[in-house]
Regions:
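Short, surface-exposed beta-strand/strand-loop-strand elements in extracellular ectodomains
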Residues: 55-77
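Short solvent-exposed strand-capping/beta-turn motif centered on an Asx-Ser/Thr pair
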Residues: 50-55, 111
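Intrinsically disordered, low-complexity Pro/Gly/Ser/Thr-rich segments with frequent PxxP/GP/PP motifs
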Residues: 70-103
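Hydrophobic beta-strand residues in large extracellular and virion-surface proteins
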Residues: 48-50, 60-62, 76, 83, ...
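Beta-strand elements of well-folded, non-transmembrane domains
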Residues: 52, 66, 122-126
Length: 127
């Protein structure tokens, strides 16, 4: 059985309206195959960096939950925190990382468009 693979996600902007950033859904297993795959994708988020590339402070919040979600209580990073001009904040997840199954979406909202850059290190595999 193959082991998990490590990937870098981003850089990409965090939108100024709730939008999906990361999800591990397999959209197609199309093709001819003699076996059925009884596995589901899983992502382990190890590290996230949010960088403000502007000359002024900008708020940002990341969430885990439904697609394009920003429900209270699902915040995982930022929680409306102002990221100082030309600065970054980081979050490291302990153990094997923040587990995200196929139904989980990492979403985000920034206080201004094209201001906050998202980057992450993840490990992806199948369960």
């Amino acid at each position: 059985m193959a082991s998990n693979r490590q990937f870098r996600v981003g850089p990409s902007y965090v939108a100024n309206a709730a939008a999906n950033i990361l999800n591990g859904t397999v959209t197609s297993l199309a093709g001819t195959t003699p076996v059925s795959l009884f596995v589901a994708p899983v992502i382990y988020v190890k590290h996230i960096t949010l960088t403000n590339k502007t000359a002024g402070g900008v708020t940002c919040t990341l969430y885990v939950g439904a697609t394009a979600g920003s429900a209270g209580g699902t915040e995982i990073m930022g929680q409306g925190q102002t990221i100082a001009a030309n600065s970054s904040i980081e979050k490291f997840f302990a153990g094997s990382g923040l587990r995200m199954d196929a139904v989980d979406f990492l979403t985000g909202v920034a206080g201004a468009a094209t201001s906050i850059v998202f980057e992450a290190e993840i490990e992806a595999g199948f369960q």
